[in-house]
Amino acid sequence: MKTLKAVVAKYNQTSLILRILIGLAVGSVLALVAPGAGWVGELGSLFVGALKGIAPVLVFVIVASALAQGSSKLDRRFGTVIWLYMLTTFLAAAIAVITSFMFPVKVVLADAAQSDVIPQGLGEVLSTLLTNFVANPVSALMNGNYIGILFWACMFGIAMKNIGAESTKVFLANTADAVSQIVRWIINLAPFGIMGLVYTNVSGNGLAIFTQYGKLLALLVGTMLFMALIVSPFIMFIYLRCNPYPLVFRCLKESGLTAFFTRSSAANIPVNMSLCEKLDLDKDMYSVSIPLGATINMDGAAITITIMTLAAANTLGIQVSLPAAIVLSAMSALGACGASGVAGGSLLLIPMACSLFGISNDIAMQMVGVGFIIGVVQDSVETALNSAGDVEFAATAEYHQWLKEGKPLPAFLKG
């Protein structure tokens, strides 16, 4: 018993990032030497399932509790966060257009993929987003509809603030703390979940599947890395007037790494909230901005939609004009907001963007098929970019306000 306690203590004392890296290595080795050990992959499924299960409850109780206590301060910082989320998503789409023009890619179209219902136009995507605001609150919690969860949590919190007894508000605050503790327990087991996810990917997908579509994959990943390491840091520098890379690399390490394997911004919400707490951000702000970011901060999705659409146009010999490219950027940025919370969700919006150039749904669905083939890497990098950006710009808005108030930036940004 003492030995077990000692092992658990040593496990908890070890850096979470180091534990995740060890889990990554162990999962890779097990996939190579024992590809038939399906139980290892189940660890990944359980981890992602736990995160997806607790995330909607976490968002609801934290937002409702903050508003009920009367402490939620959705001031200029919140407007700054929304502006940064939307700006970077549009810039990501615009940069994807530029890189596609610089390095035009044609692909050998695969068979059309069978998928969920495809949005037929931008209006349908926006209509769905608005409808999600007033979706049944129980249904929103069950389905991970974070727009609906935020709306009803705000309504519930405001109502509770006006009519709730103090004891009820304390209970709500205690509930929020209890759910946050459960999240910390789940995140503490992340190395086992990452091990299972890596095992599933390595044992089920060989590198040979990427050979045929290597150029397309390289363009997608290269554009996402350019966005993550050049464009986003530059925007952060404009607001903070200091070296942004300590914050960038911390977000990529603690948020992006986990998101790379979960492949879901929604599932990574608890991880991001934990990171925001470490960054000393205002809980009243990040409890709203992080779930919102998981819905509207979709840099990677905008890049995927844009590049895949232009690859289809190149393959068919369609000449894309500059005005059409600008419209595509806007359509991809807005449409990407409908891809949140779904692994590979951005691929389902390719037909919508393809319709701008008169590309048939059959051809567009073949591009979706190509996307699923390279999705092991593309979707992982896309989600890492999206999720890390959620924290980066929530922190940027917060720290920008600190500078306005004469408050010093955190020590790690002063180095």
Task: List the predicted regions and their residue ranges.
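Transmembrane helix boundary and interhelical junction motifs in multipass membrane proteins
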Residues: 58, 193, 264-272, 302-308, ...
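Membrane-water interface of transmembrane alpha-helices in multipass transporters/channels
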Residues: 39-40, 75, 207-215, 242-250, ...
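Signature of multi-pass transmembrane helix bundles
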Residues: 7-33, 45-51, 76-247, 407-415
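Transmembrane alpha-helical segments and their short flanking loops
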Residues: 307-415
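Helix-loop-helix junctions within the multi-pass membrane cores of secondary transporters/permeases
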Residues: 254-336, 393-394, 407-414
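Hydrophobic transmembrane alpha-helical segments of multi-pass transport and channel proteins
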Residues: 50, 86-90, 94, 221-225, ...
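Membrane-interface alpha-helices at helix entry/exit sites of multi-pass transporters
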Residues: 73-81, 181-188, 278-294, 322-323, ...
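Juxtamembrane helix-boundary/capping and inter-helix hinge elements in multi-pass membrane proteins
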Residues: 67-76, 162-166, 205, 241-244, ...
